[in-house]
Amino acid sequence: MEERILTQNFTQEDASEYSLRPRWLSEYIGQQKIKEELKIYIEAAKMRKEPLDHVLLYGPPGLGKTTLATVISNEMGVGIKITSGPAIEKSGDLAAILTNLQENDILFIDEIHRLNRSVEEILYPAMEDFELDIVIGKGPSARSIRLSLPRFTLIGATTRAALMTSPLRDRFGVINRLDYYSVEELKEIIKRSANILNIGIDEKAALEIAKRSRGTPRIANRLLKRVRDFAQVRGNGYIDFKTSKEALDVLGVDEIGLEYIDRKILVSIIEKFGGGPVGIDAIAASIGEDGDTIEDVYEPYLLQIGFLNRTPRGRVVTKLAYDYLKYPYIEQGRIEGV
């Protein structure tokens, strides 16, 4: 049971992605404030010979929440078990994981906001008292026993912290929001990844990829690999500025990182809904995309760069986006310039 919940089948691409992940805080680029805080918490926990307090990491996908969890386990010198909220279907699944933890181990739960509520309730005494309540038997003969657990650290990760229940969220002693990365930070990540993958790349090319990576390391590394493919097939394998620009144009990633679906979302709101406000379900239906995917993957970046606003009545495309897409701006029924 535990093996099914805790392991995945890794592809060669997954293995390559894993090799790019930093192992120590000193190697981790970006999120400076979080790194400084964690360094203090980790040192203090090690001095007291105690597990690190429970940690909640939240923010858009691809910013390094899982990577940061593995870095914390390395810095603490403890083991880590990785699972996700949807994978823990029953309370027995969680009980099996918790009882197999070693002293001071880290349990990392990705998408923790998707935990089943009955499973979540088992976590409360486990997080607070390192004890597990188990019901044995059914009906009138059922009885509850309490098992002692090894002291552990729970690291939860979520892209949607607002969907977590207050009782669960309040049990985390350390709560950190991961922010989008600067272009300069992404450039350094790309250069580091290129070095690990033995890819030749110049400064301007790394900067060009960084500009189109939506502030997200996962996207930066993905684009680097695809540009590498382009350089090997169309060039001599070395990534210069010209090669990077041509490859990214072929991939449909524009100068600020917008992709086909981003433009489709914005154009749909402008052409079909007068620029908004419009609900996420209507947007999803109009472009044939899942609403959760729009909210989790595409919308955060459009909000970040000021192309989209969220209002109580729905999503609204901003003047900035109209100008970028070269559409006449419509405000309160009036076309600007007319």
Swiss-Prot record:
Q: What is its main location?
A: cytoplasm
**Catalytic activity from the UniProt record:** ATP + H2O = ADP + phosphate + H(+)
The UniProt transmembrane annotation reads none
Top-level lineage group: Bacteria
* UniProt subcellular location: Cytoplasm
Q: Where is this region: Head domain (RuvB-H)?
A: 255-338
Instruction: Report the protein name in the record.
Output: Holliday junction branch migration complex subunit RuvB
| Species | Thermoanaerobacter pseudethanolicus (strain ATCC 33223 / 39E) (Clostridium thermohydrosulfuricum)
Q: Kindly list the organism's lineage.
A: Bacteria, Bacillati, Bacillota, Clostridia, Thermoanaerobacterales
